[in-house]
Amino acid sequence: GCGWGGFAELAAREFGAQITGITLSKEQLAYAKARIEQQGLSQQAQFHLIDYRDVSGQYDHIVSIEMFEAVGEEHWPTYFNQVKRLLKPGSSALLQIITIANERFDSYRKSADFIQKYIFPGGMLPSHEALEREFDNAQLRFEDSFYFGKDYARTLAQWRHAFLAQWPRIQAQGFDERFRRMWLYYLCY
């Protein structure tokens, strides 16, 4: 999914890219469209409310940022086959995927942890080895990987700080102390 349109805005503004963004969220769709319009980039970016499995056409590049974790392990082959089908010959995909250590994957996938139970129900992190298998099965070439776990820890810390700063506004929307504790735990996880 295109999320809130941040990457689409960056790619359109900085690189002149023509963007097709997809999402299942009406709220994200409205926000992304407004964001792009506000930046004067509407001619470069279009957004659609559609499931990735229903997208047609072919693209020069595909970017997927932390969406894969939400598709569920049973849909991993579908995801990679769709990426392959949507790529023009000779084109590329950049996939930002949160992974779990190879040695922890088998035990992790057998029972839900805190994040799977309370934050991202149905979510499943792949291991690096599991990703390589899925790439191979879809006949996609896995070229490179980059790990930035320490950067993500800083991101979570910044999100926690922002969450606490905005708590009065969040609470005013009807969210209770249990919700606050749950998200603080996640952001310190």
Where are these regions (language model features)?
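Conserved SAM-binding loop of SAM-dependent methyltransferases across substrates and taxa
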Residues: G6-F15
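Conserved SAM-binding motif I beta-strand of class I
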Residues: Q18-T23
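Conserved SAM-binding loop
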Residues: A32-K33
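Conserved SAM-binding strand-loop segment of SAM-dependent methyltransferases
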Residues: Q39-Y52
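A short acidic, Gly/Pro-enriched loop at the edge of an enzyme's catalytic core
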Residues: R53-I62
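A short glycine-rich, Lys/Arg-flanked "PGG" loop and its adjoining helix->strand segment in the class I
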Residues: P77-P89
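Conserved beta-strand signature within the Rossmann-like core of class I S-adenosyl-L-methionine
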Residues: G90-I98
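Substrate-binding/catalytic lobe of Class I Rossmann-like enzymes that use SAM or dcSAM, i.e.
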Residues: T99-Y189
